[in-house]
Design a protein with these regions (language model features):
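Short beta->alpha connector loops
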Residues: 7-13, 69-71, 101-105, 124, ...
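Active-site-proximal beta-strand elements of phosphoester/diester hydrolases
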Residues: 2-10, 94-102, 135-140
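Core catalytic region of metal-dependent phosphoesterases/phosphodiesterases
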Residues: 2-91
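Active-site-proximal loop/helix segment associated with metal-binding centers of metalloenzymes
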Residues: 37, 41-42, 144-146, 176-180
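Short, well-ordered secondary-structure micro-motifs
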Residues: 39-41, 74-78, 84, 108-109, ...
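Conserved beta-sheet core of the metallophosphoesterase superfamily
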Residues: 102-172
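Short, Asp-centered acidic motifs that coordinate Mg2+ and/or phosphate
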Residues: 26, 96, 116-117
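Structural motif
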Residues: 91-92, 131
Length: 180
């Protein structure tokens, strides 16, 4: 199964459209979906109404967690749950701890089993690495990247986690082994 991971859309309709083009089976949203937050500039094509309409069209394919810019008001317009701070899923036989990153992060990991993947957003940086027995993954920011990185998203296809820019260039890639 093919999974599309996106974080920190921040209301950008331009970057939300990429999921439909990907032919992925599931869309995993790592928070900060609609609002840009008081510290960020407006992202390209900022239109939260268009974003929630597009996301609601594929609500049955979405797994989502809450980001620090997401609110109860956002949940009122979304037809899928996104108020949990984290969720645990199994994708292609690998355990994933999915969170935004404002509570748990690379420097504050939850207890994870050997071979698990910790995937988060929040820092707006693309990351794909192994740290000890845990995979640390971050698709980067779809709309407001930091440190001169391009706008990005990730695809998990079989056991390969690949981070792409929106021109289709591979930024980072890692093979996830089931039992490290």
């Amino acid at each position: 199964m093919k999974y599309f991971f996106a974080s920190d859309i921040h209301g950008s309709s331009f970057y939300t459209k990429k999921y439909k083009e990907s032919n992925a089976s599931k869309l995993v949203l790592l928070g900060d979906l609609l609002y840009h937050g008081p510290r960020n500039d407006l992202p390209k094509d900022y239109c939260p109404k268009e974003v929630f309409a597009m996301l609601n069209e594929c609500k049955d394919d979405i797994i989502a967690v809450r980001g620090n810019c997401d609110s109860e008001v956002d949940q009122m317009v979304l037809d899928f749950p996104m108020q949990s701070d984290y969720c645990i899923g199994v994708f292609n036989d690998i355990y994933f701890f999915i969170t935004h990153g404002h509570i748990y992060g690379e420097d504050h990991l939850p207890q994870l089993a050997k071979g698990s993947a910790f995937i988060y957003g929040h820092v707006h940086l693309p990351i794909a690495k192994k740290s000890g027995d845990i995979y640390i993954l971050n698709p980067g920011s779809a709309s407001l990247p930091k440190e001169q990185n391009p706008n990005s998203y990730a695809i998990l296809d079989d056991d390969i986690f690949t981070i792409y820019d929106f021109d289709g260039n591979v930024l980072k890639e890692i093979k996830l082994e089931k039992n490290i």
